[in-house]
Amino acid sequence: MFIDIPSKLEAALIERPLPPWELDGSFLAQSTIERYRKLTTIPRFEETAAMLSHALIGEGGGYAVLRLGNLAKALGVGDRFRRLATAFAAEVAVPFSPFLRWPLWKDIGVKIDKDPGKSSGIGYNAFHMDLVNATRPPDYTTLLCVRPDPLGGGPSILSDAHAAVARLSEHSRSLLAETAYHYGTFFDLFGVGEEYKPFPILDGSDPGEGFVRFTAKMLERSKLGQAHADAARELAEELVRGQVSFMLQPGDYLIVNQRRFLHGREALHSGQETVPAAGRRVLLQLFLRARAGDGSAA
């Protein structure tokens, strides 16, 4: 779902600077959340935040793109703009950074010499959930577009994970529910529990609920038994079959409910080596944790 900001709300937000955020460990401090919540006194802010929440947790929902492009044009993409994006995120859940060596917002640029399948690579970034091998993955992953690929590539892709699972055979689903999968490393992480290895792709929740712990990268980079690999490959095919894709524009803020949707990115356009490093695609990533007792991400 794409959500436009009403023009009067945009004008009011431009005139309402927010204070710098403070962190409690790696989480946005409650004092900052309370200060940012003063934006609810602006007409249409709460209504817009409610639309955002419904798009993420309402029936049939699971992702939203908040169109903040006019705010980015007016304010630039520096601290003032990022504070506004953080304020909207805090209406959904608690912003945090699981990476101790990174700031709250993690910069995802383009590195032409990086593994093409990585988030900062230039190739196809297949469907996955972030921090798939943590016992408590972020409930939401969010991406703020600072600059799209100037050559026109790299549309975002999303797919309803539970809808894809529902199209599989009962045999494949039973294999995906076995603790037989593993992927990646786990170090210097905070707020996401412990390493989960091995893990099931389906966690035994009722149909349509819980995480679908999947990353297509494990099909190539993890040693899996043949039957389990085949079941995971079938899931990957169904995710592609049900995908939606769109190009993020400057200021677009994509928020994904990880309990419902998996995400990825098509390859960037060829010729990235001709684009100066300072002119390549840039996204900023922020993670969110559902509040204690909040079933909104279930």
Model-derived regions, located:
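Long, mid-chain structured domain cores
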Residues: 37-107, 115
